[in-house]
Structures are given as structure tokens and as C-alpha cells.
Amino acid sequence: MRVNLSISLALTAMLLPLSCSKINVQEGAGSLPGNRVLELTVGSGPATKASAGKTAWIPGTDRIHVTFAQPTESGIAISEGFYNIKNSDGGTEPDGKPVLWQNTNPAAIHAWYWPSGDFSAKIDISDQSTPEKVRAVDALSASISDVKFGTKPNLSFGHTLAKIRILWRDESRLWSNWRNPEVLASNARFFSNSMEVSLEKESTGLYALTAGGDAGWIVPCPDEDEQMTWECLIPAQKISGAAIKLTLQKGEEEPYESAVFIEETTFEAGKTY
């Protein structure tokens, strides 16, 4: 099952005014005043929606992919390249061939942080059982329009997946302190219609997040601070029916599996449930 998401629609909307409005297009990049190389910064931290996920950039290790869209006499020119995060202040530098301004017209930028570093690689989301494995699923994006020549835009990244937070709080089975429950819950699972995500380049030259693979159960990460609490990241989708499974055990009794049913719910990217 494949679910095509609309992550790139925001930038497409940004491009429409550039292509439809009357703009005095300036050609002749060789005569541009100042630096032709696109310069940019990133926010202080990638706004991951998972507490066990990525909470800060790692200078010298992390890099982002930038798509740069600018109107020219022949239409919208798309160029792309990678930028390394070079310091804790969010400074960046081109990784390889730099992205260049073609003229002085306002432009649009769409950027991705892909945890594997390989933009052609698919991400398997089935095992998020540790903080490290949650961070391996963090897929972030940022968009900005009407970027003026000679400025240094700041990109604010947000998550492209939805965050699921499971809290087991059956008050009828807890003692006075919920940290010492009468019934222990473990082996949490969360159902997803798609078990992998990838980036695909569209005909517009922009990248879109695509969810695919078989449906199945995700192993979430236990919260490090709250007992009987788990979290995981899933692609945007609709889910109904048995969505959560827990293994429950009271004392020395035989453990049993309990399923939690939910009404049809639309899980949106960047939100917490």
C-alpha cells in the first residue's frame, strides 16, 4: 500500500505567484552585485516531535538538502545541493557544488533533513525501540518563499511524520503510586498502514515524502522519564480499529495481550497524538 503525501504542495503554492505574476526578470548572472552563492542558516534545533528523537543539530555531521526555485525568462529554474551544518549557531556551508542565484528575482527554498544522509534510501519505521532508532526515523523539512537576493534566510525545520504517544493509565489497576502498578504493561505495539517512508522527486523538481510498504506493527520507544509510556513516529494516515497492543501481566499470573481500539482518526504530519 502506498500513500502519497502532499509535503511538497506548500512549495508548489509558493512557486505559483512566481510563475504567474508579472515580474521584471533580471538575466545576466555574471553581472549580479555581491555573492552569487546562496547562503542560509538553520534554526537552533530541528523541531522533532519525539522526545527520544533528534533535538539538536550535530555540527560537522548533519547536512540538509536544498532545492532552490527562481523565476527566469524561460520559467522557474530549479537548482539543488547539499549544505553542511558547520556550527551550533546554525551556520551552514555548501557541501560540494554550491547553489547559485541566477538573477536578483525573489526565490523559494525547500529543504530536507534525511536521517540516513542518503536521499535515495528508504527508511524502515518498524523498529523504534530505542532513542537511537527513533532518531533514525526523524525526517524533517523546511520551506520559505520570497527570499530576497543578498539576504541570508533562516530555515525552521518541522517534522514530516506524526508522533504517537502511548500512556497506559488504568487507574482501577494501579496502586497509590502509578510507578508501582498492580498490572505491568510491556511489549507495546502501534499499528501503521505503511512501514517505510522515502523521498521521491516529482516532475516539478521538488521532493515529496512517500509512505509505502506493507501494513504492520511498530515497536515504540519506552519513555526514559515516565513508566508505562511509549512513543513512535508514523506517516500521515487514517487508522481505525485495533491500533495498540500491550502485553499485560498481574503478579505471577500468565501474561496476556490486550488490544486498544480507536475510532477512525486522521494522523497529520507534525502533530502529536
Region annotations inferred by a language model:
Residues 8-17:
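Bacterial N-terminal signal peptides
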Residues 2-5, 18-273:
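Sec-type signal peptide cleavage vicinity
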